């Protein structure tokens, strides 16, 4: 599939057309999310201003009343500043030196032990550390990454240099198909 062409068309359409883009924050979690271990950390991140991004944020977006994405997200992706990440680490007794977190390409991964990684909380939560927070939309006190930013990041993840191509490839195909059917 020629992703650059489709992504360019989508981004131009988002900029130039009169589509109504809304966010339904209730779509970010299941009805029983509060029962999952680690949900306290999710609430803490939202309260401190972390930006929800990735598949979970995509699931919340609607264009002209139609949901753009419907895959059930398995993890939480947040964009945070280094200061925010350090605060979370301090509050959970985690340091870079103790091996409890992995730092890969500016991402701090809090992973479930079933993946073989050290864990802080038994829910997949990825903190993507940036020098500055990207543009976002805030709805009901929750910050969501801009739709174009999420699509750009998904595209970067299907480049030949990444291993997690299948999930992100399928996500982009779904977004393109649904966007073309608006």
What feature does the model see in each segment?
Residues 47, 93-97, 180:
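Residue-level recognition of short, structured coil/turn motifs
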Residues 93-136:
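Conserved catalytic core of two-metal-ion nucleotidyltransferases
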Residues 2-28, 74, 118-182:
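Catalytic cores of NTP-dependent nucleotidyl/adenyl transfer enzymes across multiple folds
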